[in-house]
Amino acid sequence: MAVPPGPPQLLQVLLTISLGSIRLIQAGAYYGIKPLPPQIPPQMPPQIPQYQPLGQQVPHMPLAKDGLTMGKEMPHAQYGKEYPHLPQYMKEVQPVPRMGKEAVPKKGKEIPLASLRGEQGPRGEPGPRGPPGPPGLPGQGIPGIKGKPGPQGYPGVGKPGMPGMPGKPGAMGMPGAKGEIGPKGEIGPMGIPGPQGPPGPHGLPGIGKPGGPGLPGQPGAKGDRGPKGPPGPPGLQGPKGEKGFGMPGLPGLKGPPGMHGPPGPVGLPGVGKPGVTGFPGPQGPLGKPGPPGEPGPQGPIGVPGVQGPPGLPGVGKPGQDGIPGQPGFPGGKGEQGLPGLPGPPGLPGVGKPGFPGPKGDRGIGGVPGALGPRGEKGPVGAPGMGGPPGEPGLPGIPGPMGPPGAIGFPGPKGEGGIVGPQGPPGPKGEPGLQGFPGKPGFLGEVGPPGIRGLPGPIGPKGEAGHKGLPGLPGVPGLLGPKGEPGIPGDQGLQGPPGIPGITGPSGPIGPPGIPGPKGEPGLPGPPGFPGVGKPGVAGLHGPPGKPGALGPQGQPGLPGPPGPPGPPGPPAVMPPTPAPQGEYLPDMGLGIDGVKTPHAYAAKKGKNGGPAYEMPAFTAELTAPFPPVGAPIKFDRLLYNGRQNYNPQTGIFTCEVPGVYYFAYHVHCKGGNVWVALFKNNEPVMYTYDEYKKGFLDQASGSAVLLLRPGDRVFLQMPSEQAAGLYAGQYVHSSFSGYLLYPM
């Protein structure tokens, strides 16, 4: 049976009940009941006619404390005789037609005007925006999955930083502990006699009668040399002497070393070429990390990072709308956000060098390095602690006679004493009375030359003398003015590569360098740490791998036991023995005079008993720096010495095979200028001079071709103490070489 449709009132009631029981769900979130703000009832103009439905008015049925809730925009339905205004999802409820017919009022029933519902008015303008509400509680989002580490970037390539400023000199350290008392010193040498004292005052004149003249006495013993007399008047110019013939005297013995002079003033800073770069030293141990440096200046703001994907929707119940509060205080600093993408490289920072860091711990002692070259002479050190008193020295030279004392009382006659040593001559007394003429004395020694007298008158021009022998080399003169630049010489041959220098001390740590440009993306990083997981199922055995690389050679094994003796071999056939290495054939071709070279110089025997024709040649090195002056330099380390013609004990080459020889020497200069000469039979044939520059090691060379006869001697020698800075060391060699070019 069909159910007839109910009246419109029943439909509205059912619709109201169904809507009141619905809970609004948006995006999976549940919204509870909220109190609605009071709404202004819609204004209904009375002139608009409305239909009056039949039946009784349906009173308002509240379903909650404050009315029906359909959302935030739901108006509140008041009690009254009118129908509630029910919005349906932002749409107004359309009047329900009655089967396509309009409602007709019944007879006898009046419809009050207040119950008539007018048409919906136009939508009003939006109201002003309310004040912002208080900040909500921070959401608690689920942290995202940790991303995989990115690939390792390429190592940046930056320019090396500028060298740091030299650090300030450190403060003077605490005085060291008192050293142990040194060994007792030896008795010192006899001191230098003191200066002669001033003459004493004249004695009081004696009181006595003059005696008669005595008999002439015997001639006295030879007196001591009298004091130096005053210079006499210039004598007349004597006749011109004959030409003298004298041999140069032997060089005197080297005197005792003088006292250390005060340190000289600091010289100007030298300007020289930098030395050859030494090999890098061994890598030191890893130092402890230094203290964190000061933060650098803030760089420019980087490019904002790419916006991340929206997070998962939060789960929570919406609270009730509160009354808009007053603007709150500024919120605290939020948590640090995720790091953005790296920005472009900033401008190079210009910062001051930081303060020197604290002194680090003392590192592990390194391997002792090779012996360095001899350093320059240091300043005179502070006087040391006084040693224990030494033994009494030898009696010194008697000093000069002191001034006479006052006349004392006559004492008792003493016993005869031991005859003392002869005293020094007393001061010159006043002239006495004229004595009798004595006998002529013995001829005295020649006195010292007097002070140079006044120049005498210019004498007549003498005859031209014979040409004298060349004199000894004089003391080098002062440095002359700088000469004009000479003509550039031909380019010399390239010398042999030098020996690598000793590794210098490490310089101070410089300030941090300017950051280099951004490097290219690096290669994939090393594999991460092994994860912690359950062991998987054992896989199948794979194919055998390729054979590995050949390992390092093992240590040689112990020698095995000797084997049994072998069978005797066949008889040997001795081939003719060639000349040993370093020997030359006797027939050396024509000499300078066109005659075949003689064979009389093959007196030595070779290794196999035959004659050995060894070339006269040698090269010797100097092992100790600063050899003595005025004597042949002893190059005592031999590299080669054919026929043993060079003597390393004396430093002299003695010719045995006459001929034309070539000699060369290479010396180093350090600590002072150097002046060397090549001598042939005590006559210098070539000089070489080099000026020393402080802080640099210089070199000088020389060579000569000499014609030698048997017995001629050739050697090197330094003629002056003022230029004796010849240096040699473990890795700095001074050498002397010579060899026969062609025999005579």
UniProtKB/Swiss-Prot annotation:
Ranges of biased composition (kind: Basic and acidic residues): 101-110
Compositionally biased region (Pro residues): 128-137, 288-298, 389-403, 558-579
Extent of the signal sequence: 1-27
Organism for this UniProt entry: Oryctolagus cuniculus
Summary of subunit composition and partner proteins: Homotrimers, or heterotrimers in association with alpha 2(VIII) type collagens. Four homotrimers can form a tetrahedron stabilized by central interacting C-terminal NC1 trimers.
Entry PTM: Prolines at the third position of the tripeptide repeating unit (G-X-Y) are hydroxylated in some or all of the chains.
Region (Triple-helical region) location: 118-571
Name under which the protein is recorded: Collagen alpha-1(VIII) chain
Function: Macromolecular component of the subendothelium. Major component of the Descemet's membrane (basement membrane) of corneal endothelial cells. Also a component of the endothelia of blood vessels. Necessary for migration and proliferation of vascular smooth muscle cells and thus, has a potential role in the maintenance of vessel wall integrity and structure, in particular in atherogenesis.
GO cellular component, one term: collagen trimer
Residues covered by region (Nonhelical region (NC1)): 572-744
SMART domains membership: C1Q (SM00110)
Stretches assigned to the C1q domain: 611-744
Biological process according to GO: angiogenesis; cell adhesion
